[in-house]
């Protein structure tokens, strides 16, 4: 058993999966209505005990760094662009490096990380370089997310990085 931090957690699918695996879960999203929806999903799933946090993810992680908190797993599904609850502007290309630098400080040495990226401004090579910069010699993998179309074209959707 360990703890999982789900950032940009939206309606909580990953939070529920982690809780069902008997993990302590912290679910962070900046939109109160979305966190309420996730809490309803927890009730429908007959699970209990997820910690709900309505806050800017970067601010939350920054405080966790100061507290010396460590997580066994961190899940990140940041939007390409967004506006936080207090009007904070989020642009993935500008903030991802800072976010990963701080996340690296709260991920336990043998912990796992899943990062989903949906931005045309970031390539798999950029994500690979960021992972090397902030997670050093830890083993990780990068994959592209895509769909096959009815016309036999591959449609790019995003990138996933996993430790």
Give residue spans per PLM region.
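Conserved class I S-adenosyl-L-methionine
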Residues: 2-10
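Conserved SAM-binding loop of SAM-dependent methyltransferases across substrates and taxa
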Residues: 11-23
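A structural alpha-helix within SAM-dependent methyltransferase catalytic domains
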Residues: 16-19, 65, 100, 104
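Conserved SAM-binding motif I beta-strand of class I
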Residues: 24-29
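S-adenosyl-L-methionine
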Residues: 31-75
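Mobile active-site "lid"/loop adjacent to the S-adenosyl-L-methionine
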Residues: 34, 54, 72-102
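Helix-to-beta-strand junctions that scaffold the AdoMet/dcAdoMet cofactor pocket
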Residues: 107-108
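C-terminal catalytic and target-recognition region of SAM-dependent MTase-like enzymes
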Residues: 112-163
């Amino acid at each position: 058993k360990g703890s999982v931090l789900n950032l940009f957690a939206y309606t909580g699918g990953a939070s529920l999966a982690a809780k069902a695996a008997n993990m302590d879960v912290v679910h962070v999203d900046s939109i109160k209505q979305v966190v309420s929806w996730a809490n309803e999903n927890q009730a429908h799933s007959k699970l209990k005990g997820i910690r709900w946090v309505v806050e800017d993810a970067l601010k939350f992680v920054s405080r966790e760094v100061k507290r010396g908190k460590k997580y066994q797993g961190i899940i990140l599904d940041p939007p390409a662009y967004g506006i936080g609850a207090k009007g904070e502007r989020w642009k993935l290309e500008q903030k991802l490096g800072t976010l990963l630098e701080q996340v690296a400080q709260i991920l336990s040495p043998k912990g796992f990380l899943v990062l989903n990226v949906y931005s045309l401004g970031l390539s798999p090579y950029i994500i690979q370089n960021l992972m090397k910069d902030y997670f050093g010699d830890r083993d990780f993998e990068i994959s592209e997310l895509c769909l096959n179309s009815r016309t036999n074209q591959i449609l790019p959707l995003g990138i996933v990085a996993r430790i």
